């Protein structure tokens, strides 16, 4: 979600979120067992992001943070401005997800991150889990990039369902290092679910990927 620290590119939305934080807070408080919130950080605004971490993570109901790969808040995850924010989140034990994508021809935006760059960051915090959003898009390359960094998990959404993706991820990483993502509302939930449901893996592995792994990261106990 967005909490008014310049992540949307819409001044009116940003002003609304800053002036009426209850718009975000009330749904999380009403359905704490159904809504487990994460919010985007903006490394271009260090003070604002640090304040948001304190307000929404340390003192609030959020459970994790997301570093975007595009838009006004995008900063490559190896940038020095990202590190103090990661350190603050790690101290709180919260989930960290980083948008990652490999593009044909290389990066097209200054703030984009790749799985290899996330692996570089994650090596500095070997006891803290990081989620590699979208498995880098080009998932074969993405899986290989983070394979040797055991505290990095891949997330499944954002690219077309392709035979062999989940099977390779389970084979190379283990089912415990894969978390399901829907990418709603811009992707089809059925398509995203089919990546896991139709995969040639065990039912136990499917349960881990479809929810148990992420619940473990969040510290949610049934």
Regions found by a protein language model. Give the residues of each.
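Active-site-proximal loop/turn and secondary-structure-junction residues that shape catalytic pockets
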Residues: 3-5, 43, 69-71, 102-104, ...
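Mid-to-C-terminal alpha-helical segments outside catalytic/metal-binding sites
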Residues: 174-177, 190-222
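Conserved, mostly hydrophobic/aromatic
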Residues: 24, 56, 65, 89, ...
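Short glycine/proline-rich, acidic loop/turn segments that cap or connect secondary-structure elements
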Residues: 181-189
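Active-site gating/metal-coordination segments in enzymes
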Residues: 7-104
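Short beta-strand segments
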Residues: 1-2, 40, 131-133, 155-156, ...
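Short, surface-exposed alpha-helical segments at coil->helix boundaries
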Residues: 18-22, 112-115, 190
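Catalytic pocket-lining loop regions of alpha/beta-barrel enzymes
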Residues: 60-64, 76-179
């Amino acid at each position: 979600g967005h909490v008014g620290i310049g992540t949307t590119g819409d001044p009116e939305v940003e002003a609304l979120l800053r002036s009426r934080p209850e718009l975000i807070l009330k749904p999380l408080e009403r359905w704490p067992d159904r809504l487990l919130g994460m919010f985007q950080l903006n490394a271009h605004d260090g003070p604002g992001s640090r304040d948001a971490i304190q307000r929404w993570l340390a003192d609030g109901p959020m459970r994790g943070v997301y570093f975007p790969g595009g838009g006004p808040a995008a900063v490559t995850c190896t940038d020095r401005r990202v590190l103090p924010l990661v350190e603050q989140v790690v101290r709180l034990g919260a989930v960290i997800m980083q948008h990652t994508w490999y593009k044909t021809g290389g990066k097209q935006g200054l703030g984009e991150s790749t799985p290899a760059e996330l692996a570089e960051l994650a090596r500095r915090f070997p006891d803290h889990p990081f989620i590699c959003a979208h498995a880098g898009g080009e998932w074969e390359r993405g899986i290989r990039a983070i394979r040797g960094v055991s505290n990095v998990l891949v997330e499944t959404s954002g690219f077309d369902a392709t035979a062999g993706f989940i099977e390779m991820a389970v084979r190379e990483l283990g089912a415990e290092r894969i978390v399901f993502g829907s990418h709603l509302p811009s992707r089809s939930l059925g398509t995203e679910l089919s990546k896991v449901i139709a995969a040639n893996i065990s039912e136990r592995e499917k349960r881990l990927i479809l929810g148990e792994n992420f619940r473990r990261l969040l510290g949610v106990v049934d």
